[in-house]
A protein has these predicted regions:
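Conserved sequence/active-site signature of Rossmann-fold short-chain dehydrogenase/reductase
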Residues: 35, 97, 147-149
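Conserved Rossmann-fold NAD(P)-dependent oxidoreductase catalytic core, especially the SDR/UDP-sugar
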Residues: 53, 75-116
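NAD(P)H-binding glycine-rich loop region in Rossmannoid oxidoreductase-like domains
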Residues: 34-69
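N-terminal Rossmann NAD(P)H-binding glycine-rich loop of SDR-like oxidoreductase domains
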Residues: 1-6
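Conserved glycine-rich Rossmann-like NAD(P)H-binding loop of the short-chain dehydrogenase/reductase
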Residues: 8-17
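Active-site YXXXK catalytic motif of short-chain dehydrogenase/reductase
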Residues: 70, 117, 121
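Rossmann-fold cofactor-recognition segment
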Residues: 24-36
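NAD(P)-dependent short-chain dehydrogenase/reductase
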Residues: 126-181
Length: 182
């Protein structure tokens, strides 16, 4: 919304149209799977100043689909945008890339991803860092920790916890021994 208020043209690429609650009339929506390179090339004709890769399969049960959407999708996007030279390519990584590394983590912390999702995110980060080092690709990688906010799906951690607390019910959680530097 803020990008639109600033007068920016916003384009969203997704395999599905946005839910009604998230639909914004001034956004150009392109239905396309970023894991399918030919389709992606066909759908991305113009240049963009800024690219923010929020893409990826949310349900991590299907490991192959999870890997493809997060890693192969990122590689396909960068292949296209290497030729279009955006001002910045922002990759949404994950705190999961660190795995159980000692907290607090920083950019020099050892990464030990434990899930296919985290492995795909780390491979994407390594791919992007390599592009930066070899081709000066303008990348910024953000490793977010429990991002949440308005209009978030109810099947995510923070909404699950809030809903359970309101209803005075138990919610799934760990033993609480993890430390995260937010």
């Amino acid at each position: 919304k803020k990008s639109l208020k600033k007068g920016w043209q916003v384009t969203s690429i997704s395999t599905k149209p946005p839910k009604k609650i998230r639909y914004l009339p001034k956004v150009k929506y392109i239905l396309c799977d970023i894991t399918k390179k030919k389709s992606l090339k066909k759908n991305i004709k113009k240049t963009f100043n800024y690219v923010v890769n929020l893409g990826g399969y949310v349900d991590h049960i299907n490991k192959k689909k999870t890997f493809k959407s997060h890693y192969i999708g990122c590689k396909n996007l960068t292949e296209i945008f290497l030729k279009k030279t955006p001002t910045a390519f922002v990759q949404m990584g994950s705190s999961g890339e660190y795995g159980r590394s000692q907290s607090p983590q920083n950019e020099n912390s050892t990464c030990n991803p434990e899930s296919i999702y985290s492995q795909a995110k780390l491979l994407s980060s390594k791919h992007l860092i390599n592009l930066f080092e070899k081709k000066n690709f303008p990348v910024t990688i953000l490793r977010l920790y429990q991002a949440y906010g308005p209009k978030q799906d109810f099947n995510r951690l923070i909404p699950i916890v809030i809903k359970a607390c309101i209803k005075n019910k138990k919610f799934p959680c760990s033993h609480g021994n993890q430390l995260r530097d937010f």
